[in-house]
Amino acid sequence: FGELETSNKCVGWVKDHLALDEIGVFLKRYGNATDSLEQVEFNMYDYLEEVIDPIPAGSNGVIFTPWLHGNRCPFEDPNAAGMFFNIRLNVGKTELIRAVVEGICFHMRWMLERQELKTTKYQKSKTVRFCGGGALGETTCQILADILQRDVVVVESPQNIGAVGAAACIAVGMG
């Protein structure tokens, strides 16, 4: 229904600026020195899932806008910027991390709502198929389901679905 071109960059920003030290501790506890880079990335997402799960919905009032490189959908605004709102003295890193995930999910809801306004001839689906790296986390899937108020179904091999689609387009193009 749309794309948020910086959702993975938002998570990368969290990793680099909010959680790098904690992720190192987590990897020492659960990781292995021989893990591949891909496995380390999965472990990083496991860490993020672990720390945001106990934070209540709404991130204790913290709101994040996920536009680290402008906004492209549903409205184009190259000057839009990512921001945190409602930061108070009692807000910790985990609330900020969950707010990033919620901000991404609320943006997905915004795109879906705009798409549904444009396509009135189709019945509103009660199910949304989720792909990409975020679909690997149960907590992230539940946050998306709660925000969309729909069932979320994770596609098979969600982190690779873009490459599969590109390969299918190439195959069709080549005959």
Segments from the language model and where they lie:
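Short low-complexity, flexible loop/linker segments enriched in glycine and/or proline
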Residues: 167-170
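Activation-segment/catalytic-loop signature of the eukaryotic protein kinase fold
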Residues: 51-164
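Cytochrome P450 heme-binding "Cys pocket" and the immediately downstream C-terminal segment
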Residues: 172-175
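A short helix-loop
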Residues: 1-73
